[in-house]
Amino acid sequence: MNLHEFQAKALFREHGIPVPEGVAVSDPAALGEAISSLGGDAWVVKAQVHAGGRGKAGGVRLVKGSRELEHAVGELLGGRLATHQTGPAGLPINTVLVESLTDIGRELYLSLLVDRARRRVAIMASAAGGMDIETVAAESPEKIITLHVDPAAGYMPYQGRRVAFALGLEGPQVSALVKLLGQLYRLFVDSDASLVEINPLVVTKTGELIALDAKINLDDNGLYRHQALAELRDETQEDAREARAREHELNYVRLDGNIGCMVNGAGLAMATMDLIKLHGGEPANFLDVGGGTTAARVAEAFKLILSDEAVKAVFVNIFGGIVRCDLIAEGIINAVKEVHVTVPVVVRLEGTNVDQGKQMLAESGLNIITAESLTDGARRVVASVQ
């Protein structure tokens, strides 16, 4: 789950991490109060969407005077912002963040994330702040500093000093970064985050460290421990199908192809997509219906897949380990009838009661193609859309 910048900065403030003075505005009528609260005669207006590249797309604007501020807020609120991360449709702008200006001396990069290979929290830092960190990693990997935090010991001040020296900080700035990293680590652990990023972390001309931007991604598996954070979810920033899938305990990710996939098990789902690609097809989605698949869940999965108009065929690949194949076949038949599926459906079943399941599909009288193997199923479904 992603947080908006203004939500992330609110958490930063709670943990003592310095951020610019700012006010989140969702209604233009609240601008007067925001101006009074912030003071000054120049501000930065930032569109609040779950995507990077906002500045290049016109979503971050420097304004002078209340008239320019009103114009910028009026243009952004209620519109959509398309960046290189959103696709051409963009994301809706329901809130803007109005902030006081910061006197920037240097721009740095700082983040904490989960390194799954090392099973540790990784601290990443770079003197090339304000840039796309993926670009820095690809073009100048030597500019990125990476340290790992031992989960038993936790963050240690010496690690902060190593980062500070590598970034070229001096004097009080070293102590400030050591403290800031400790606060970031505590926030990361306390909120079950998967990523906490500051880009840029600025050194002002007076030598202060300020988080000019803030990005927090939370681990969905830990949200049950953080009800207040879970309530910050903005579903308008998410794919509507993915939100609907969550309600029915389905793991769904939309892709760009035309072959819908329904599989039980994440590993089998990925293997299924690989084979579709291998045979010249393009998966329209990743969909894991889970181990305890039921007829109702299968029906909902069909509805979800077919709500994508790009889908021209569906490949159902189920291994009946926890559930019996005859029950799965019954669910598929009922779902095809209920949803009025008009595209070809290729089904590959394997496991408990597989013969009964295949017989039920064959006798259903529906447009269901039974595959003998995973490879056979991939070939058949790709052929059906060509």
From Swiss-Prot:
Keywords: ATP-binding, Ligase, Magnesium, Metal-binding, Nucleotide-binding, Tricarboxylic acid cycle. Residues 9-244 form the ATP-grasp domain. The keyword Ribosomal protein does not apply. ATP binds at K46, G53, R54, G55, E99, T102, E107. InterPro entries: ATP-grasp, ATP-grasp_succ-CoA_synth-type, ATP_grasp_subdomain_1, Succ-CoA_synthase_bsu_CS, SUCC_ACL_C, Succ_CoA_ligase-like_bsu, Succinyl-CoA_synth-like. Mg(2+) binds at N199, D213. Its cofactor is Mg(2+). This is Succinate--CoA ligase [ADP-forming] subunit beta. It comes from Thioalkalivibrio sulfidiphilus (strain HL-EbGR7). The lineage of its organism: Bacteria, Pseudomonadati, Pseudomonadota, Gammaproteobacteria, Chromatiales.
